[in-house]
Amino acid sequence: MAKLSGSIDVPLPPEVAWKHASDLSRYKDWLTIHRVWRSTLPDDIEKGTVVESIVEVKGMYNRIKWTVVRYKPPEGMTLNGDGVGGVKVKLMAKVRPADEGSTVGFDVHLGGPALFGPIGMIVAAALRSDIKQSLQNFVRVFTAPDPGTNGDGGVRH
């Protein structure tokens, strides 16, 4: 199983960073592997919530059925994913207080028969850069002073 991690400092209070990191409807704006939701998104997320999406890594698409197995606002959530071909994915999102706001982190675990051998190494390498780009996108999307993309950008009026 490939295990990948990444984190980035975000100039937002933890509660605001959490709001954005846990907003499934906004994944298309910053999470590079997310293509489209294939199920209706719930109004509220809780342990046991199930959603389906299409993800893409290195030009390879897979339909993933995600189950929320841990949901602890504003600290983190874990989604276990089962994909076509026995692909297994675990996505762990974490938000921690930091000196200048928050640290947002993602851990991704990949497994299953389709990801053994050379193809697994290629996917893991591609996913490593996707995690880094996604975290940079997160900062750009949710901290830029553009009310059209991020509301107040975490600024308190």
Spans of model-derived segments:
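Glycine-rich portal/gate segments that line the openings of hydrophobic small-molecule binding cavities
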Residues: 38-85, 103, 133-157
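Beta-strand/loop substructures that line and gate deep hydrophobic ligand-binding cavities in soluble
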Residues: 80-133, 149-151
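Amphipathic alpha-helical segments that line or abut small-molecule/effector binding pockets
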Residues: 15-18, 132, 136
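Hydrophobic/aromatic beta-strand elements that line small-molecule binding cavities or substrate pockets
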Residues: 6-8, 64-70, 89-97
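Hydrophobic ligand-binding cavity/cleft-lining segments
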Residues: 1-46, 156-157
